[in-house]
Every structure is written in structure tokens, then in C-alpha cells.
Amino acid sequence: MAGNAYSDEVLGVTNWLKDKSSQEVFSFVFKNENVQLNGKDIGWNSYRKELQDDELKSLQRGAETTWDQSEDMEWESAVDDMTKKQVFIFDSLVKKCLFEVLSTKNIAPSNVTWFVQHEWGKDPGWHCHVLIGGKDFSQPQGKWWRRQLNVYWSRWLVTACNVQLTPAERIKLREIAEDSEWVTLLTYKHKHTKKDYTKCVLFGNMIAYYFLSKKKICTSPPRDGGYFLSSDSGWKTNFLKEGERHLVSKLYTDEMKPETVETTVTTAQEAKRGRIQTREEVSIKTTLKELVHKRVTSPEDWMMMQPDSYIEMMAQPGGENLLKNTLEICTLTLARTKTAFDLILEKAETSKLANFSMASTRTCRIFAEHGWNYIKVCHAICCVLNRQGGKRNTVLFHGPASTGKSIIAQAIAQAVGNVGCYNAANVNFPFNDCTNKNLIWVEEAGNFGQQVNQFKAICSGQTIRIDQKGKGSKQIEPTPVIMTTNENITVVRIGCEERPEHTQPIRDRMLNIHLTRTLPGDFGLVDKHEWPLICAWLVKNGYQSTMACYCAKWGKVPDWSEDWAEPKLDTPINSLGSMRSPSLTPRSTPLSQNYALTPLASDLADLALEPWSTPNTPVAGTAASQNTGEAGSTACQGAQRSPTWSEIEADLRACFSQEQLESDFNEELTLD
């Protein structure tokens, strides 16, 4: 920039201050006051006693060198030798105090950044500014540093005092110095607590903007304010002359000035608030954002996913209540901003959608075993989970045991995460766990009894208030319900009396999914990634989770007597006991099914003429089609399921026509 216009010393100091521009340091002021003890006056220049400590002598010689090197040769300084000597002694005493405190903290001076400047003011007279900081310094340590420096400063002042004092007067002088706080720390007063807290300053900014811009004192006694000498840990400002100091200040100011001025708009609410957030508030808000982002809804999830923040809050006073309230805010945020369908959908791994087959999922295999259109059933469930079912806000899985009700409901609840459970054992507060949730799970529901009206309100998605144990009432917002049962919940009994007036209202609030086929023992559980992929597949293929889309796809809103088998699917589904791909399933043929018979001669005519059928099995085809050799083979070829009685009959008629049976039987008789 200006390598040819400025000296290397000026540019070196400027770059050094820029490197330290963001370092926070303590700001101390050393001073003394005029004291009178038993008629003896002790002023600011009464501390010129010759020092016997070798380290103090070395520090004093360093101050003398700094003064000589920073003198401007264009004019001669008018400061007398007595004033100079007093400043040199003060400089050595201040640095001695700093080094002694560093020694007590086991901090190496090389790891510390400091700056010292002696000044004269109209009101305080002589005083010394000290900036000190480093990686081992923190804001709460500021007051401890002030107390320690005050003790060392008072002790060394008494040692350097050249006024003849008795031992008692020396002790009194030290008490005055300590009680009057001749070492002060820069602090600020909190608006609400009214307490003083340490205020750190930026090292580079404070030196360039404040200290280097001052004028040097050249008269004795000093008439105006200014500085005597300054030094620092990097030996950068020690030997700068007054003009060079002003030039460094100007260069630093020009380079650190922002190019554009950012304007901020403060709303009336923010201006009215006018408060400073505490560190605890900022920490809680940061933790809360992380919990919501990671969908943490229980203390166990918090312990596993964010153990550091959990331990930090637990260690604070009232930590248990703080954890509970923070988690409640997190679940409330999820319940108000997301639906159960949203929470399931965001867990889908889109990379698996390309090879995903909805027909191969355990959920769809259960539905297909009942002959249902599994896409239609899943679409209806997703509409309810997305709060689009209107008054029909509950998915009811009912039927005999071991038909897959609970494993489907469990997979959905696990995918949602933020789930509340109905507790039938808690007669007075059964919905205690159902507030601020995205889904309510009612497992093995029974007779509603006295709670039927509450159940109807929650199952229809109404906003109601419930009582909680040890608390006041709390509001439950519209929340989808998933319910499993082996009983007929539409029959309400209060005492020994049935209430049929509740049957139809309960049916109007339910998405009826009646499972009747028992699963084999090796069927297994529904995978946790299954429902997220099902939801993503539906969205990808145009089955949006809205009732308008459902009606456009399937014709009408689902009701209690909904026929899930219509419209039929063309895609075959494997049986429940098989985990193989449909392409690997062997075709059903007469030879593979081992339907060979050896009829008697008297029964040949009956076998060929009378249809083999049961009261529940329709007769297969006409006589013309039954007597052809192709009818039986086509009845089972290409099918991916077990043959019906009609297909078996067609196969037998194809293999054992009357003429063929008589011919085979006659051949056997001839051989015998």
C-alpha cells in the first residue's frame, strides 16, 4: 500500500495492532493519592527511594532507555529529572506487580499480551494504564486480578516511599492504598442486577484509537494532560516518537474503517424490550434449535443424541425442571409446525426409491392377503396422518389376534417419533401423556365407558381440554389417532347397560381396517424404514395426502363400510409365508400339484360328467371348455397364488376325460 511512504517501524506497529484487533483484554488503572499521616505529606512524587531489588533495577533501566529512545531530537524536553525518575520507578513497580501475579497463576510472560502507558491528567494527576490478556484469561477472573494487583501495588509503594515513616504509619499507608482501591478495573453495571461486571476491551482498537492519539508531556510540572512513556510485550510502541504514534493511529483507523455502513432496523417491540440476553438464555435457545432440528422428543433421545447439552443443563440449579421445560417447548414446536405425515416423510431415504417395490413391503402384503388394494389403504392412512381426514381422524386396526394390527401401528408410531400413549390403567387421567404430540396411540382399546365423550372428541380431531395429574387442565390440539383392538369398540357399556346411541358416531370417526388373516409365526416385524418409503412412493406417484386427491383417485371419502378391494390391482402379490420374489415362485400346474388319482371303472362316468364343486365354489366353465386339453393348463398358468377348487376341477377334467380314463384302465387290465 504505502511501502515507500512510511517507515518499517510504523508499518510494523500497524500490522501488529491489526493482528491483535479482536483480542479481548483487561483494562486496569494504577494511581496514588495525596495522603497526610501525623502531619507528614505524602504526594505522587514521594516514592523515589532507591530500590535494592535487582529485578526492579533492571526494569527501571529499561524505562530510562525507552524514554531516551522516544525523545524527539527537534526540541529538548523540559521535564525535570525528579519527575523522570519518579515515572521510571512507577514503571518498574507496575511491571513488578504484573509479573508477580503471573507467577502465582503459573502463566509464562511469553503467553501474555500487555501494554503499559504512564499519563498525567488534570484531575487524577499521575496514573498508569495497563492492558493485559491472553489465552489463560477469562472475564470472571477480572476482579480477582484487581484484588491481587492492589495488594502488590500497596506493598511496593510503601517500600519505595522516601518519607520517613514509623512502622505503624507504613502499615496505615498500606491500608489506605488497599481500602481506597489505588488499582481499578474497567467494569460496567448491569441494568437489571445492578451489579458491576468486568468489561473487556479490544487490545488493538484501544491502543490505536485512545492511547496513541495523545500528546507527549514536555513540561515540568505538567500543565496539560498527556503521556510520559509507554511499552508493550512486543516491543513495538516503546521507541515510537510522538509523530510516529499519531501516524500509526491514523493508518490503523483508515484500514479498519468498514467500507460500507450497514443499517439495522429496530422494531418498536425490540426497542421496548431493551434488554441484554444472558449467556444462559443464549445457550438454551441454541440447544432448543438443535433439539427441534434433530427431532428429539424424549429424555432418552436427548441423552443419546445431545449428551453434552443434557449434562450442561442437568448441572445447573433446578436442572430437572429446566430439562423438562426445554423438552416440552421442543415437542410443542413439532406438534404445532409439523404433521405426523411430515415427520414420517422426512425420514425417507430418497436413494432407495428407485429400487423400492411397494408390493414387497410387509404392510402391503398383509393388506393384499385380504384381497385389498393396498395403495388405496395406505393412501387413506396417510390422509388421516396428515390431518386431512376431516371428522374421520382415527385409524382403527381391529380383528383377531396375530393378524398384524400392532406391528403396523408400531411401525407408524416409531416413524412419527413424537407420540403420546393412552393409559387405560389411569382411570382419572388417561390422556396425561397425549398433549403436544403429533400422534396418539391407543393400544388394545376396550370399552370406553364413562370416557366415551372424551374419546369421541379426540377421535374426531376436536380441540379439547383435559385434566392432568398435579397440574391444571391443558389443551389438546387436533391430533391423529391410531388405535388397535380385538373388541368391538362401537358397543359402549356403562355399567351393565349398553348405549347404542354411541355406535354410529364412533363409526363416523374411524377409518375401518378389519384384519382377519392370521400371520405365520416367521412373518417378522415391519421394518422402521418401510413407512417412510411408502409415504415417499405415494407422493412421488401423485397420491398426495389430501382428501381432495383421495376423492379424485378413488371416487369418494372412505366410510365405515369401505370396500378396500375396489378397484382391484393387477399386480400379483406373494403369499404371507413366502419372502421370495414373484418371478421366482413356481407356476401352479397339474403335475406340480400332484393331483393324480386312480378311479374305479364304475366311477369313470361320474368322474367325467358330474362337476366337482362345493357349495361355496362355482362350477368352472362350460362343458366345451372343460373337455379341451387347454382349459386346465390355462387355469393355473401365470397365477402367483394357490389354485381354487374350480381350477383344480378344470385340471382334473383336462387330464382325465372319459375316453382317456377308459383307455388307460383297459391297458392296465390287459397287462395284468
Swiss-Prot record:
Residues 21-259 form the PV NS1-Nuc domain. Its EC number is 3.1.21.-, 3.6.4.12. ATP binds at G399, P400, A401, S402, T403, G404, K405, S406. The keyword Nucleotide-binding applies. The endonuclease active site can probably bind other divalent cations. A motif (RCR-2) lies at residues 127-129. Residues 615-643 are annotated as: Disordered. Residues 373-528 form the SF3 helicase domain. It catalyses: ATP + H2O = ADP + phosphate + H(+). GO terms for cellular component: host cell nucleus. Pfam families: NS1_C, Parvo_NS1, PV_NSP1. GO terms for molecular function: ATP binding; ATP hydrolysis activity; DNA binding; endonuclease activity; helicase activity; metal ion binding. Residues 191-195 are annotated as: Ori-binding. Its cofactor is Mg(2+). Phosphorylated. InterPro entries: Helicase_SF3_DNA-vir (IPR014015), P-loop_NTPase (IPR027417), Parvovirus_NS1_C (IPR021972), Parvovirus_NS1_helicase (IPR001257), Parvovirus_NS1_N (IPR021076), PV_NS1-NUC (IPR049901). GO terms for biological process: DNA replication; symbiont-mediated arrest of host cell cycle during G2/M transition; symbiont-mediated perturbation of host apoptosis; symbiont-mediated perturbation of host cell cycle G1/S transition checkpoint; viral DNA genome replication. It is found in: Host nucleus. In the N-terminus, the endonuclease region is involved in binding to the origin of replication. In the middle, there are the ATPase and helicase activities. The C-terminus probably contains a transactivation domain. Belongs to the parvoviruses initiator protein NS1 family. This is Initiator protein NS1. It comes from Hamster parvovirus H1.
